[in-house]
A protein has these predicted regions:
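N-terminal metal-binding scaffold of metallo-dependent hydrolase/deaminase domains
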Residues: 1-40, 48
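Structured core elements
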Residues: 5, 25, 58, 85, ...
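Divalent metal-coordination and catalytic microenvironments
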Residues: 9, 24, 29, 49, ...
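Active-site mouth loops of central-metabolism enzymes
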Residues: 59-67, 156-169, 192-198, 363
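Divalent-metal coordination cores built from histidine and acidic residues
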Residues: 69-184, 277-279
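Polyanionic/metal-chelating signatures
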Residues: 96-118, 129-130, 149-161, 242, ...
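Functional cores that coordinate and move charged inorganic groups
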Residues: 154, 163, 174-302
Length: 379
């Protein structure tokens, strides 16, 4: 007798073959039979014509910060996702350094509340972090990347400079340890400090470490808009020089004037593969993106630290300088015209509202509103 029998399902087996109708038997957590009239089971599920297929792989996720908050991953499982690749965009939950803990938490705050992360207990060693995850009853499978921003902060904090030879060696050694522990590779978030401060050469050195383990590099490239082609070319050069597989994360062309550039970037990928590289990309099928509001602050200012940034935005004499710096880094044709508040701990009433609409209701300049929210939320 089987443990589970799923009957009358439209089966897609994942091989590329046409779908077919049948039953699936499960024993000890494994599929042991596919066909018709398979026999009895302790539990029978009548699919009644629904589709039964292998679980989907979410190739770009930030759920590694949420294991202890909601290990069921119900939202993912409900959509058929059974495996998640975590630690993307240069952000991972390990390794953390006691010396630069504030920097690591600042990076992690892009995707999770830092108060929660601290209360959960930061795991400083990558192997310790993986061992800890083994004891959490997660609702699906997961594969972990090492975030370059987290790795860089582990060694040198949020400094806007090139690493010394000693610091670069420390990053390489730490990445070796992470790969030995079971990491899939290294991810880059080149629009977010401190990853944004890395040179192409630094990435080649670190990617070469991942390549020794047949790993992969995933990159949120430096620019997804006006300089998209140059940004993709940089990462292809990193892949070529390091002999490492590359995935360009959420491949897209931001802002309507840049629509159509994806044809050129896809051509770059095809040409790279014809020359012997292994370059891939993932994407999502809608014209939107999601990131922290803090990303509106120019990269070169992030090295000042959160407290200094809040001080600058709160000081009437410095506020106009900050406003000009923020606006200078945005597309003049759009700026905050397409920006929506996804969440704000200090202002939950803004959730789901457009920045321009809230600014109009409050009779505030949109950029002034954004700076107020950043200060109130402590970035």
């Amino acid at each position: 007798m089987y443990d589970i029998l799923i009957k009358r399902a439209r089966i897609i087996d994942g091989t590329g073959s046409p779908s077919f109708w049948g039953d699936v038997a499960v024993q000890d957590g494994k599929i042991v039979g596919i066909g018709n009239d398979l026999g009895l089971a302790r539990e029978t599920c009548d699919a009644d014509g629904l589709t039964l297929c292998p679980g989907f792989i979410d190739s770009h996720s930030h759920g590694d910060m949420m294991f202890e908050l909601d290990p069921s991953f119900f939202q993912e499982v409900e959509q058929g996702v059974t495996t998640q690749i975590e630690g993307m965009c240069g952000i991972s939950a390990a390794p953390f350094s006691e010396t630069h803990l504030d920097s690591a938490l600042e990076i992690a705050a892009t995707v999770v509340d830092c108060d929660f992360l601290q209360s959960a207990g930061c795991r400083f060693d990558y192997q310790q972090y993986l061992d800890h995850l083994e004891h959490i009853p997660a609702g699906n499978n997961y594969v972990l990347m090492v975030g370059h921003g987290t790795l860089r902060a582990f060694v040198m904090g949020m400094d806007d400079r090139e690493p010394t030879s000693v610091e670069l060696q420390k990053m390489e050694e730490t990445l070796h340890q992470c790969m030995e522990a079971g990491a899939l590779g290294i991810s880059y978030g080149l629009q977010y400090p401190p990853g944004a401060y890395a040179s192409t050469e630094e990435m080649v050195h670190l990617s070469s470490v991942a390549a020794k383990y047949d790993g992969v590099i995933a990159a949120h490239v430096r620019d997804e808009g006006n300089h998209l082609l140059e940004a993709d070319q940089e990462m292809i050069q990193v892949a070529r020089s390091s002999h490492c597989k590359l995935v360009i994360s959420h491949h897209k062309a931001i802002n309507q004037p840049n629509w159509g550039k994806s044809q050129k970037t896809l051509s770059l990928i095809e040409q790279a593969n014809q020359r012997g590289c292994n370059v891939y990309c993932d994407q999502y099928p809608y014209t939107a993106s999601s990131t922290g509001l803090k990303s509106r602050i120019p990269q070169h200012l992030h090295s000042l630290g959160e407290n200094q940034l809040i001080s600058l935005m709160s000081d009437p004499e410095q506020r106009s300088m900050m406003q000009n710096a923020i606006l200078a880094g945005m597309n003049p044709e759009q700026r905050f015209g397409t920006t929506m508040f996804g969440a704000s701990p200090a202002h939950p009433e803004y959730t789901g509202k457009m920045v321009l609409d809230v600014a109009r209701d409050l009779q505030k300049d949109p950029c002034e509103l954004v700076m107020d929210v950043l200060c109130d939320d402590h970035l």
